[in-house]
């Protein structure tokens, strides 16, 4: 293992399984254990799992916890009032740019959990601390590096989790999307994910991670690496922070307007003024390449309405063609024919709505 990189509680387990390890946001993480293609298909057709312990869980507690979060993020946590209920939101800077995207869980009015990206965790914690201090919010922000997180995804994922941990089934069987069961011993079983498939993201003590991983392997859940995670999230139309949006990109430039709540006019969250006064929306849509080739990030897109740019791209294992996300002129419509600059050649592509894949099946685009 690399001494200069951070490691999750499952690092030695990955190495023992023959994983190819890479640097991801300062963490040594598995890229793949064998065939990335087979790992991708396992999630679409059966069940696969990912070590996502590099992401940071942080608890936000105190009398002002709810007010603090209503100011900190663009979505409105006030609509969460059932323990375990969650929402997805962006945390914005005063210019409306995205500092990070995160999931927020409600435990009680004075107790919340946020899950932030690995590469932005230190920046996020520093930003939250500054916001809390500047606003005199009575909150305590506690990073929980004592916890691990495993995402089990696929049509058979939940059944295999219950086979490995039968005691979790009664509390988690009836969960709807974006809802978690809060279990004893610092365990959270959430019906969330980053693949477009059903499944759970499980937060548990770091000391319990290896045993759960091994028990899931025994149930036939396939370990998957970051390579498959990226192709799965692209097919599912899910953004990657640092690639599809960053601090210079507003939510309405990344297909994330739905994560911004403007209903309460008195809730002046950070970045709201910029969104209301200086919004520069654009179309954020999918592209499917019409010929051979592979789209990647930062490729020019030529449309009748003007130029655009890809933000993420890959070869889709499910569709068998290259797919991409692109920021395009606002009046470009799904179904439009465009061209993508691939190594100096303009290759035709079709504009389509996201996602490309839903519940393991290709979404039909006219």
Swiss-Prot record:
UniProt keyword terms in alphabetical order: Aminotransferase, Transferase
Superkingdom of origin organism: Bacteria
GO biological process: glycine decarboxylation via glycine cleavage system
Gene Ontology molecular functions: aminomethyltransferase activity; transaminase activity
Entries under InterPro entries matching the protein: GCS_T (IPR006223), GCS_T_bac (IPR022903), GCST_C (IPR013977), GCV_T_N (IPR006222), GcvT/YgfZ/DmdA (IPR028896), GcvT/YgfZ_C (IPR029043), TrmE/GcvT_dom1 (IPR027266)
Reaction(s) this enzyme catalyzes, per UniProt: N(6)-[(R)-S(8)-aminomethyldihydrolipoyl]-L-lysyl-[protein] + (6S)-5,6,7,8-tetrahydrofolate = N(6)-[(R)-dihydrolipoyl]-L-lysyl-[protein] + (6R)-5,10-methylene-5,6,7,8-tetrahydrofolate + NH4(+)
Signal peptide extent: none
GO cellular component labels: cytosol; glycine cleavage complex
EC numbers for this chain: 2.1.2.10
SUPFAM superfamilies: Aminomethyltransferase beta-barrel domain (SSF101790), Folate-binding domain (SSF103025)
Entry function: The glycine cleavage system catalyzes the degradation of glycine.
UniProt family annotation: Belongs to the GcvT family.
Subunit and interaction comment: The glycine cleavage system is composed of four proteins: P, T, L and H.
Protein name listed in UniProt: Aminomethyltransferase
Gene that specifies this protein: gcvT
